[in-house]
Amino acid sequence: CLMFDREYFEQGPMTGKSLYTNYRWMPELTIPLCHHLVTECPIRIDDTILDFGCAKGYIVHALRLLGYEAYGVDISEYAISQAPKEVNGYVQLIEPYAELPGKYTWIIAKDILEHIPYDHIDEQLSILHDATDDIIVMVPLGDGTKYHIDAYEKDITHHIREPLEWWSDRFKHAGFGIDIETHDLGPFKSNWQGIHPEGNGLILAYKNEKTFA
C-alpha cells in the first residue's frame, strides 16, 4: 500500500502524513508492552499470536524474545522490508482484506482498525473472526466526527472516529463475544489517559463460547 511508505513511518509530521518520526526498534518500550499483553490477556506460552498490522514487526520480535510463537502481517511493503532479520519468515506482506495466512489463538490489533474505511470494517472484522479464537484490540475513539484526542487527527490514514460502544457493536455483528470493553487501557496507553479519559478503547473478544480465565 503506497500510503504507508517511508515518509509515513520516518517523516510523518514533516510530510503531514502521520505522527511517526524515525519509526524504530525500541526494546525498552516494546518488550514491556508485550509482557503486559501476555499477562493481562492472558496469553499462554503455547498459544499462537498474529500481530495484525505489524508494521516493521517489532511486537512480533518482542513476543518471540519472550518465548511466544508470534507472527505478523501488514499491507505496507516498505514496513515489511524494514523488519529486523530476527523476524524473517515470521512477518509477511498481505493485500488489504485478504484472507489471513493461518489460524491463531490470538490476534492483536493495536492502533490498526481505525485505518479501515467504514465501508470495509465489517468485511475486515469477519476476516479476523475467521482466523482467531480471541482478539485484543486497542483503538482511538471519537464522537463520530472527530477524535477525542486531537493528535490522532494528524494521521491522514485514519478513517473511523467512533465511540467504544460503536466498536463493540461491530465486533458483535462479526460474530465475536465481548469479554472486556473499557476506556482504561492501564499500562498500554498511560501517556494518553490524562489527555482524555475516553480517548482510547480496549476490547477483548472471543469467537468460542468461553471466558478468559
Predicted regions, residues:
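Conserved helix-to-beta-strand junction in the class I
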Residues: 127-131
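A short beta-strand submotif of the Rossmann-like class I SAM-dependent methyltransferase core
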Residues: 106-112
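A short acidic, helix-capping loop that chelates divalent metal ions and anchors anionic groups
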Residues: 145-152
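Conserved beta-strand signature within the Rossmann-like core of class I S-adenosyl-L-methionine
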Residues: 132-142
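Phosphate/nucleotide-binding beta-alpha loop and adjacent structural elements of enzyme active sites
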Residues: 164-175
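Conserved N-terminal segment of class I S-adenosyl-L-methionine
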Residues: 1-106, 119-126, 142, 154-166, ...
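Short phosphate-binding/catalytic loops that engage adenosine nucleotides
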Residues: 68, 133, 176
